Each structure stands twice: as structure tokens, then as C-alpha cells.
Amino acid sequence: MVETSHALPLVDVVLLFAYKRTGKTRVSMAFKDYSRAKKGGAADTLYFNAFTEDLFTWDNDLEGDSDRYLSLNTNSRFFNGLKDLVLDEAIARYLHRYADFEFDIDYVDWKITFHKRKAGARNIKISRGEQSLFVWCLFLAICERMLDGHESYQWAKFLYLDDPISSLDDNNAIAVACDLVQLVRRAPSRKDQDGADAPVKVVLSSHHALFFNVVCNEVGRGKDGPKLAHKRYFLQRPDENGKFDLQPTEETPFFHHVALLAELHRAAEPTGRLFTFHFNALRSIMEK
């Protein structure tokens, strides 16, 4: 974690690849604690991780089965200035790229209702995958305002994205990756309200190999915007002392299948442990 923090002043973006159950969320929380300790306890990082989606909870109207909505936990700083930011249009612009449902945000009761674009059904319960997409689109809209230098997010000096997509098909994974990089390109040139330089440093971690590869390729391209200075790492499982190992990958092609084989080898050892994702990894390798 300290290595990642030390790398950030030298680059615009740090990219971490790690398998499921490696501890990516723990690493993001360690980053938060380390950063806050350096700032005397003041928050300076805008996060997207497992805790972000927990800020949204369903009321399924079990009695009437008709008034279903998603509640927002407005105690979180994540929603600072949400009402004044007028995000509906920006959220819809992203959401229409990935899904076919509409939404309405009630800023009085802080709840969100959904309906189908074509069928017209109201107050529908969307799937978990659709909910993840909506939360992600809301987050992108907030990031836009943050990078615009809006006063509600002037406190954010870092942007930490932990597994922004967990279960998307390949087409959406590619689209989300490209949209994200287009937004991140603005981070180094952010200005504050007085016009002074206020760059944002970005950390992205993911277990999704295709998504990670697309992001790596896009941040290194200068065709559609400025090339971003970045470092790439493979985050390995913590050892018996709980210490994580970061393997740099800038000098060689991204070694997804080699790393999978190494992980399977460790799991097969007498001291290793097998989890569901190991079987999925084996199937992935056998299908290649």
C-alpha cells in the first residue's frame, strides 16, 4: 500500500490487477487510512468500491408489492451536494449506453424509482447487475462534477476505483473501460474554483482481465486525448504475515494466463486452499 501511495506523485494513474478474494477492498481501505493519517484525519479520496453500493438499499414494498424504490444513505460524504449538482442528465447519458431502463430521483425523500423505457411499467425492481450499472453511472456523473472543480468535491485529491465492474458482458466491459479512461484523462488537468492547478491522482483495481487490458491500452494511447503517465501492477495474495506483493507489469505484456497458472499451482500445494474461482480459472485456461 505504501508502494502504491509513493508511486502516485510520479504518475497520473496506478493500475492494479488482482483475482477475486485477493483483498482488493482491504487494500482500498488501507489506502484510505494511510492517506488520512498523512492529512491529519481529513478525507481526500473519492471511492468507488464494495462500500459504495452499500449506500443504496431497496425498499421492496412487501405489503403492497407496487411502490418499490432504492433509498440513498445521505449520511455519506459520497452524496455531498448531490441535489445541487443536477446529475440526472449526466447519469442518463451514461446509462443509455449500457441499459434500457429509466430512473427518477426524489431529492426530498432521497429515493430512486425505475421504469422501463419502452414498456412503460413503473416502480420496477431492476436486477442486481442493472443496479450496479446505475450506481456506476451515478458515480461517473459525480466524477464529472469533481473534475469540473465543483466546490462540493474540492476536498478530493485522489480517485480510487475498486472493481468498478463485477459482472458485465464483454461488450459492456469494453464500453465502460473506454468511457472511464476518457473521463480519467481530465484528472491531471483539473482546476480549482480559482483556476489554480488541482490535479487528481487515480488508482484503479480490477479482477476483470478484459476490462483491465482495455484500460491499460487506452491510458497509454495519445490518439483521443493526452497520454496518461501510469504504472501497472499485479497484486498478489498476502503472505502468512498479511503482506501484499505488487509485481510491476510495465516491462512485459500483461501475463493473465501465466498468473492464473501460478495461482492454481499455489492452490494445489499441500498448504494451499481451493476456492470456487480456482475452478473458474481452470476452465478459462482449458477453453483457450
What do the predicted segments below correspond to?
Residues 1-11, 36-50, 105:
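N-terminal nucleotide-handling cores and adjacent loading/scaffold lobes of large enzymes
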Residues 1-13, 19-27, 32-33, 124-243:
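Switch/communication elements of ASCE P-loop NTPase nucleotide-binding domains
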Residues 28-82:
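ABC ATPase nucleotide-binding domain signature region
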Residues 61, 65-128, 141, 145-158:
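Extended helical coiled-coil dimerization/tether regions that scaffold
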Residues 138-141, 262-263, 284-288:
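Short, hydrophobic/amphipathic alpha-helical patches that form generic packing surfaces
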Residues 167, 171, 196-199, 248-251, ...:
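Short, solvent-exposed segments of well-ordered alpha helices
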Residues 238-268:
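Conserved small helical "lid"/interfacial subdomain of P-loop NTPases
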Residues 272-288:
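Conserved helicase/translocase motor-coupling segment
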